[in-house]
């Protein structure tokens, strides 16, 4: 097969249009621009349109991501070794050899395509040759021997024609085993191509089996589990891309894959957290209790999701009771409840900020054991002593308690004879009766607290007590008792003039 015919004047002739050229570069550029615009795919025997490139066709139709094209004849091959073997055959014999390309130009003569499936030594009308010169076989090529590529022996045409399917052949008459994709059914000739196809087309999205929601492509499974279900660590199977809660379930899943060839799942045992979006629950799940009749995917999914635990506050699903209790403790039970005003403080607001802003208490003391908050250090020490001796600390009234135990503790504090704060609401009572003292506005409480604080400052600021006396507990008991008297007098008659002669 001669692509270039030389005349007597040493000019290069184009075998398609008959034009003459002076050098090889001009002829190659002419063939690329004029005669190499369309190709014929030899895998599907279809003409590739001009608006679609050869690489796009191989990538979309046959999942072949890389091509090796001969610069001289514009034939396309799947590997670099076959391209070098083709070029070696062209240099030595002027013929392309026995390597069948993936695609060839549409302008190539019909005898070129027929010569690929015809034994050149048997003689042919389309391919004239004077002497039966041996065509170099693939196994005898020095390039392939150097690359240590194992080639299968050439089989006869009868065996290849007797097969029911028409697999792709790299050498004439040699079938290549196809590897089907388990998701879409496409066939591939290399495991690398199948792995790349699964990663690009079938592993882009996941379905969360906890909330039955589609995880978008811009969000990973780890981010979804961490933000929606409070699961900080997950384990992925590299084979099928399933996601599990712990490593024990992942190892059991891999063992099941090796033994049965398919992933198995039973409610409460080896259940994944998320599966690829294209995976069907009916197809991949082997439930412990099989359905009696032919149920659809929704029946299997309802049986699978029935074992999930849901949060009663927000409705989120969780894999285990431990995850549910942790979510309930961190999300719905975080923060404190103020005992003074019965206000629930959110997680972002600390007890110190609330007491300083609402009740003008600038310093609080927290118990490290139960996280209760007290107004004085003395109350905190009494609380700790009660914890050590009796194991119950409800005889000292706190100013704030954790939200998770607020209901039971507040009820017991109301019923018990605990240490009471000064009844600031009694000063603001009216003639409406004792029922009006149960609910005091917050502004009156803040006003009364400020009056009491001013009374203490008046007593301490008058210089009646020395530093040694202020260091004693009995002195402060006397100060608070006198401040209580001043508090009632200031509420009744306004701010009085305090004399230095206070009964000690």
UniProtKB/Swiss-Prot annotation:
Annotated GO biological process: meiotic chromosome segregation; positive regulation of meiotic cell cycle; regulation of transcription by RNA polymerase II
Q: Which InterPro entries match?
A: Znf_C2H2_type (IPR013087), Znf_LIM (IPR001781)
Query: Could you tell me the gene encoding this protein?
Result: pzf-1
Tissue expression, as annotated, is:
Expressed in proximal gonad.
Name used for this protein in its record: Paired zinc finger protein 1
* Keywords of the record: LIM domain, Metal-binding, Repeat, Transcription, Transcription regulation, Zinc, Zinc-finger
Q: Where is this region: Disordered?
A: 115-136, 154-173
Q: Which GO terms describe its cellular component?
A: nucleus
- Zn finger regions (C2H2-type) covering which residues? 12-35, 39-62, 68-91, 179-202, 206-229, 235-258, 309-332, 365-389
Please give the organism: Caenorhabditis elegans
KO phenotype (gene knockout): Superficially wild-type, with a normal brood size, but drastic reduction in brood size when grown at a permissive temperature of 20 degrees Celsius in an mpk-1 mutant background. Double mutant mpk-1;pzf-1 shows meiotic chromosome non-disjunction, increased embryonic lethality and also an abnormal male:hermaphrodite ratio, at 23 degrees Celsius.
Role according to the record? Possible transcriptional regulator. Involved in promoting segregation of chromosomes during meiosis, perhaps acting downstream of the let-60 RAS / mpk-1 MAPK signaling pathway.
What GO molecular function annotations does the UniProt record carry, in alphabetical order? DNA-binding transcription factor activity, RNA polymerase II-specific; sequence-specific DNA binding; zinc ion binding
Coiled-coil intervals in this record? none
Q: Where is the composition biased (Polar residues)?
A: 159-172
């Amino acid at each position: 097969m001669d692509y270039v015919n030389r005349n007597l004047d040493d000019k290069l002739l184009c075998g398609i249009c008959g034009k003459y050229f002076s050098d090889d570069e001009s002829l190659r550029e002419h063939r690329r621009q004029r005669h190499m615009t369309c190709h014929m795919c030899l895998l599907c025997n279809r003409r590739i349109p001009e608006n679609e490139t050869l690489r796009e066709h191989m990538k979309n139709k046959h999942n072949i991501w890389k091509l090796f094209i001969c610069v001289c004849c514009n034939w396309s091959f799947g590997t670099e070794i076959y391209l070098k073997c083709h070029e070696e055959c062209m240099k030595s014999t002027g013929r392309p050899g026995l390597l069948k390309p993936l695609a060839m130009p549409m302008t190539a003569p019909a005898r070129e395509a027929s010569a690929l499936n015809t034994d050149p030594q048997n003689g042919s009308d389309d391919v004239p040759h004077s002497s039966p010169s041996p065509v170099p076989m693939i196994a005898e090529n020095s390039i392939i021997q150097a690359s240590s590529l194992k080639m299968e022996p050439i089989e006869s045409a009868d065996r290849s024609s007797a097969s029911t399917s028409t697999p792709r052949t790299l050498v004439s008459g040699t079938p290549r085993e196809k590897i089907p994709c388990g998701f879409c059914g496409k066939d591939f000739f290399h495991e690398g191509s199948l792995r790349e196809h699964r990663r690009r087309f079938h592993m882009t999205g996941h379905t969360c089996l906890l909330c039955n929601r589609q995880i978008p492509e811009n969000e990973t499974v780890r981010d979804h589990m961490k933000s929606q279900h409070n699961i900080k660590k997950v384990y992925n199977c590299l084979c099928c891309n399933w996601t599990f809660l712990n490593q024990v379930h992942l190892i059991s899943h891999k063992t099941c894959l090796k033994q049965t060839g398919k992933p198995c799942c039973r409610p409460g045992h080896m259940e994944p957290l998320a599966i690829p979006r294209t995976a069907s629950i009916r197809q991949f799940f082997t439930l412990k209790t099989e359905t009696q009749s032919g149920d659809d995917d929704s029946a299997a999914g309802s049986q699978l999701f029935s074992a999930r635990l849901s949060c009663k506050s927000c409705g989120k699903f969780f894999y285990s009771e431990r995850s549910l209790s942790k979510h309930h403790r961190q999300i719905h039970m975080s923060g404190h409840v103020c005992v003074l005003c019965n206000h629930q403080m959110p997680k972002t607001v600390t007890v110190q900020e609330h007491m300083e802003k609402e009740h003008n208490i600038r310093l609080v003391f927290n118990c490290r054991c139960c996280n209760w908050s007290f107004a004085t250090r003395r109350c905190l020490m009494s609380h700790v002593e009660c914890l050590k001796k009796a194991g119950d600390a409800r005889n000292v009234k706190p100013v704030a308690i954790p939200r998770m135990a607020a209901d039971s503790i507040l009820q017991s504090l109301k019923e018990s004879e605990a240490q009471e704060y000064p009844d600031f609401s009694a000063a603001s009572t009216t003639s409406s009766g004792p029922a009006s003292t149960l609910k005091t506005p917050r502004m009156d409480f803040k006003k009364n607290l400020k009056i009491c604080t001013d009374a203490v400052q008046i007593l301490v600021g008058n210089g009646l007590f020395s530093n040694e006396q202020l260091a004693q507990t009995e002195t402060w008991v006397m100060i608070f008792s006198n401040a209580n008297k001043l508090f009632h007098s200031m509420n009744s008659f306004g701010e009085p003039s305090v004399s230095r002669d206070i009964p000690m």
